[in-house]
Amino acid sequence: MREPEELMPDSGAVFTFGKSKFAENNPGKFWFKNDVPVHLSCGDEHSAVVTGNNKLYMFGSNNWGQLGLGSKSAISKPTCVKALKPEKVKLAACGRNHTLVSTEGGNVYATGGNNEGQLGLGDTEERNTFHVISFFTSEHKIKQLSAGSNTSAALTEDGRLFMWGDNSEGQIGLKNVSNVCVPQQVTIGKPVSWISCGYYHSAFVTTDGELYVFGEPENGKLGLPNQLLGNHRTPQLVSEIPEKVIQVACGGEHTVVLTENAVYTFGLGQFGQLGLGTFLFETSEPKVIENIRDQTISYISCGENHTALITDIGLMYTFGDGRHGKLGLGLENFTNHFIPTLCSNFLRFIVKLVACGGCHMVVFAAPHRGVAKEIEFDEINDTCLSVATFLPYSSLTSGNVLQRTLSARMRRRERERSPDSFSMRRTLPPIEGTLGLSACFLPNSVFPRCSERNLQESVLSEQDLMQPEEPDYLLDEMTKEAEIDNSSTVESLGETTDILNMTHIMSLNSNEKSLKLSPVQKQKKQQTIGELTQDTALTENDDSDEYEEMSEMKEGKACKQHVSQGIFMTQPATTIEAFSDEEVGNDTGQVGPQADTDGEGLQKEVYRHENNNGVDQLDAKEIEKESDGGHSQKESEAEEIDSEKETKLAEIAGMKDLREREKSTKKMSPFFGNLPDRGMNTESEENKDFVKKRESCKQDVIFDSERESVEKPDSYMEGASESQQGIADGFQQPEAIEFSSGEKEDDEVETDQNIRYGRKLIEQGNEKETKPIISKSMAKYDFKCDRLSEIPEEKEGAEDSKGNGIEEQEVEANEENVKVHGGRKEKTEILSDDLTDKAEDHEFSKTEELKLEDVDEEINAENVESKKKTVGDDESVPTGYHSKTEGAERTNDDSSAETIEKKEKANLEERAICEYNENPKGYMLDDADSSSLEILENSETTPSKDMKKTKKIFLFKRVPSINQKIVKNNNEPLPEIKSIGDQIILKSDNKDADQNHMSQNHQNIPPTNTERRSKSCTIL
């Protein structure tokens, strides 16, 4: 035997795959000098090779002495059993822990485990050297040996079958005995031509082509109807195979049958060992493997959970459990295969022998003439996977195949080869016509290596067929079903067109240079979204305590209104990630959190991750840049950043639907211009409303929902909206700073006048407080991030804070996104105005929001003015507010003095807005507050839907109401600004209060509002 330092001989080599001990989990090969293998056998963890010179080589595990080398130490190098040299070994069979050998002289030897008498030596003592079975003499010319878990079988040339060992399940065909220690003949009145022992069942073929099975009846591996399973301890004819059977192979829980024209499989196929695809994991009825009907199979072999087939031209197909690489499909493909997959590693070889074991496979193959040069598996592996995966399985479609067939390394390599085509291939739905398969193996890339024989031609034709296969074909079918269930698959986001089932949307950036992945939040109306945003701004000011109540009420409502909590949770996470992508530049890191639908911990972690990534710094910097650079520039830059990061996201899960949604999101951006494209652009018009809601919700979540949304995903919706609103309020102030840059985005927003005013106010505020505010907004973002990260720490609503924290993270991310995009900044400004408005009349904001929907533009104009004031105040407030936001709940009095001043300004504006809103709706500010308090109380008891609906209405309407309130806030005293946080909560509550009773709880709210106010003051 020679190691592979030298060129492989023309006679071929033995290749090992999986846990063979010769090369653990890696392909290995060896060959014999002046000798060739003629027989291979694999047990559970050991292997045997018989050469043409009648020598026996053993390697693998040896804990039972199954190698017959006189010890129990494992052998990693094929070792000749010298004791049998004189005997001229002819055949060998490896069971789970024992080995059988027959010699030309007619003797049969056994070694290894013997707990059930499977050695046939008349006792149950194990052996570590080969002992002759005295039962067999020269009269018994052995034709075939087979060994199972604790069973043994020998078939003579005259068709007599002898079996011994364990019979607890009838696996040796003896009806009334539990086990036998010496060979016993099994007769059915016909000579036997083929025998196979599985782990706990057996089968044989008669000379007239009939198949008989016996042994353990579970999982359909006997291929018998239920009425015949009662006699499973004796051989039963499988009548459902109409053709003449040639060979049979038994695995752990499945059986493979070779007939003259087809290959049948039955039993359990959870790993794909049946080769019947991903939709059939178990069958007691023999099924034909349709994918290889065009191939002439000459040999079959079964391992515990995998199967190998050899064609008449020397090609090999494998399928089943791919762990440890035992399918021989390459170093990078350890996934399960549910249909026969061509082993492209052997395209330049003629496969002659194969044996499958428990966790490995051994193959003997000889190279085509003129190709006997050294072969590196690494070179072959790259092509192997593609070729194997793109075999001409016409019956399979990309939808039927899972995308997990490719290993991580293979996916990386494919991305390196063609990242665009690879990512698109994995994420986009199949495209009619040819596919740009970066990883597929073109015949010219793989087959030119093949010899010029008919084999090459046949292989080429097969590959030609394979190429039309869509890349999805590579996916495991088993994974396929899971993917269908998960749909996010992380890799295929939103293949479904059902909005209710969508959690993320891919959208092109406004520049259409990059794709953006954002969570999909479903809402009925943009107005509702706007209202939600406003409510979120208000709730943001509210402490997490009231917000938690609101979030609790809203959780149920949110779940009802929004299709699922997971969607909302995922969306916030997505927004956060999008934010970090743009702000922090961590696209991939954020993407992972986005994929997570767990609204609670995930969002928090995601947002924290953004902070860790430097989101705060980036946000502050971007805020400065945006405030200094103008909204349009910032918007474009943010969009470019978003587009780049989104492009990565798109590569991860690129989708046309996402792009369309992004466009629609862009349409949304006029209203949410303050929000960056990250969260918004990727969403469809359908999702615009949802996105807006989410953004508003996210903003609210950042402040309030950190505490409460963590508790409940449903509360996440409302809590998210509330905290988002609060975030919008507190965050808007920094955004207002950004709004100087976001003014352009405000121009994009429908409320252009308001945006302009907001811009002016923001610009003024930015001029005055640009650096401090930027730092404040930085702090705000930082605090938000910290706060999100702190959500687990604060845990006012421990769990609620988790879910809401996630929402808050997303909200912050959305707000930061708003910063990135000037048009979206408008929304932030509106939210900041909402903070002031909410601070003064949370209730009015709600009631007025309904009216404001019609008065949005006018109110927006007023809003702009009030925003200018409010923004200025907010700008001063944001830093304090954000700083408080970090520790806002913990340190409410840190910046109370400054906050009070800022609040006074904001309160004036907010009161003006509130009054203005009150006038449209005919409600008093106090009524709004009381209603918000009432709503808070009710929200604890009322479903989340009501809360969310009110919030939604409030968000869009809130913007105009904010404008109105700003008008009145200028006229009204500052004190109600103190209740901004309370009013935020109240406002979100007021949504329900508007539905319930706007004025009942407002009187009760003031104390809480006072606390909120103090906190909001500190925040400001």
Curated annotation (Swiss-Prot):
Entry PTM: Prenylated.
Disordered: annotated span: 609-776, 790-906, 989-1020
Keyword terms: Cell projection, Ciliopathy, Cilium, Cilium biogenesis/degradation, Cone-rod dystrophy, Cytoplasm, Cytoskeleton, Deafness, Disease variant, Flagellum, Golgi apparatus, Guanine-nucleotide releasing factor, Lipoprotein, Methylation, Phosphoprotein, Prenylation, Repeat, Retinitis pigmentosa, Sensory transduction, Vision
Bias (Basic and acidic residues) ranges: 618-636, 644-665, 685-698, 704-715, 760-771, 790-802, 816-853, 883-906
Tissue expression as described in the entry: Heart, brain, placenta, lung, liver, muscle, kidney, retina, pancreas and fetal retinal pigment epithelium. Isoform 3 is found only in the retina. Colocalizes with RPGRIP1 in the outer segment of rod photoreceptors and cone outer segments.
Residues where Cysteine methyl ester is found: C1017
Pfam families: WD40_RLD (PF25390)
GO MF term list: guanyl-nucleotide exchange factor activity; RNA binding; ubiquitin protein ligase activity
Compartments reported by the entry: Cytoplasm, Cytoskeleton, Flagellum axoneme; Golgi apparatus; Cell projection, Cilium
PROSITE patterns: RCC1_2, RCC1_3
Residue ranges listed under propeptide: 1018-1020
Compositionally biased residues, Polar residues: 996-1009
Effect of C250R: In RP3; reduces interaction with PDE6D
Effect of G60V: In RP3; no change in GEF activity towards RAB8A
Main location: cytoplasm
Known role: Acts as a guanine-nucleotide releasing factor (GEF) for RAB8A and RAB37 by promoting the conversion of inactive RAB-GDP to the active form RAB-GTP. GEF activity towards RAB8A may facilitate ciliary trafficking by modulating ciliary intracellular localization of RAB8A. GEF activity towards RAB37 maintains autophagic homeostasis and retinal function. Involved in photoreceptor integrity. May control cilia formation by regulating actin stress filaments and cell contractility. May be involved in microtubule organization and regulation of transport in primary cilia.
Notes concerning its domains: The RCC1 repeat region mediates interactions with RPGRIP1.
Designated name of the protein: X-linked retinitis pigmentosa GTPase regulator
Protein source organism: Homo sapiens
